[in-house]
Amino acid sequence: MKEIHKQPPTIAIVAGEVSGDILGAGLIRSLKVQYPHARFIGIAGPRMLAEGAETLVDMEELSVMGLAEVVKHLPRLLKIRRQLIHTMLQEKPDIFIGIDAPDFNIDVELKLKENGIKTIHYVSPSVWAWRQNRIHKIAKATHLVLAFLPFEKAFYDRFEVPCRFIGHTMADAIALKPNRQEACEYLNLDASQRYVAILVGSRGSEVTFLAEPFLQAAKLLKQQYPDIQFLVPLINAKRREQFEQIKAQVAPELELILLDGKARQAMIAAEATLLASGTAALEAMLCKSPMVVGYRMKATTYFLAKRLVKTEYVSLPNLLANEMLVPELIQEQCTAENLAEKLALYLSQEESALQQRHTLIQRFTDLHKLIQCDADKQAAQAVIALLEQEDK
């Protein structure tokens, strides 16, 4: 077999936030098995740097959230992108991998592909859900998309855009049968007690819209099940302060166990979870925690979203199952009464409710197996295959 890479390859990877840094580090580790002397360049966070990557700028420079933030930092982001493209065209890496951050990375990939550099986009944007026309630009910009979820690959296949389903790294990190006793010990909780986890979201806007209905639902649930205790993991000090201010107004008397992070352990310890939509819903599914998904947003945002979003479901467990596996209470349906009513079904000790719970957890386990594929290794294999492929 002809060896394409006599020299160790130069592999460019750009991560724009913490989740991308984690994926990048896992990918580098897996690639080093095949290419122990490869050079890794691009934009890296601390985990990728620890694996030996070189970075053009601090990854934090790219980590901006929300439209207002992006607009404010746009000149700087555009400057970094120009600088990155210039450096890549000088360095001529053997392959460029943009991890997530599609609004930043896809334009870079397009420019590099036009200049003969192989490109991969790692983590599919939600083109299957909204702004579906983006798929044509992705097709122009990339040689391959790496997708976490099987329905994403099915969408790309419809448009004949090269895509490989690699499974989800989170499914690799969480045991098929999570250990509740261990989670309780980690959180210093009494495992004989009953808990419900409440995740109000990681963004300020989510806490603003969801803290009140979630807290009111907890109050109603406490009346029905006085023995239930509530675990509230908060992503950072800023969100914790924001949540505590709302709680002081809405439910000052309600006892809660506030946690700094540790959402995964909280969901494993809990009998049920109340959460905002997003990756947290997938994590709850992998933790085998029966959940209720609640979401509210600005009326104008919701008006637009209803017209733009093309999927029947909003939460990843339901999208994966292609059925309403867990309740989704969105906008005007996201009331304390509705949330509490759906959560109460998971807490009932009646035989029929316990059987439904068992069936749901079995479905969660089947879906977990579906996306547990050793994603780091699968991603590395896809990169290697493209690297070793001779130019046509």
Curated annotation (Swiss-Prot):
A single cellular component GO annotation: membrane
Enzyme class: transferase
Organism: Pasteurella multocida (strain Pm70)
The entry's keywords: Glycosyltransferase, Lipid A biosynthesis, Lipid biosynthesis, Lipid metabolism, Transferase
Enzyme Commission numbers on file: 2.4.1.182
Top-level taxon in the UniProt lineage: Bacteria
SUPFAM superfamilies (UniProt xref): UDP-Glycosyltransferase/glycogen phosphorylase
A molecular function (GO) term: lipid-A-disaccharide synthase activity
Protein name: Lipid-A-disaccharide synthase
GO BP: any one term: lipid A biosynthetic process
Gene that produces this protein: lpxB
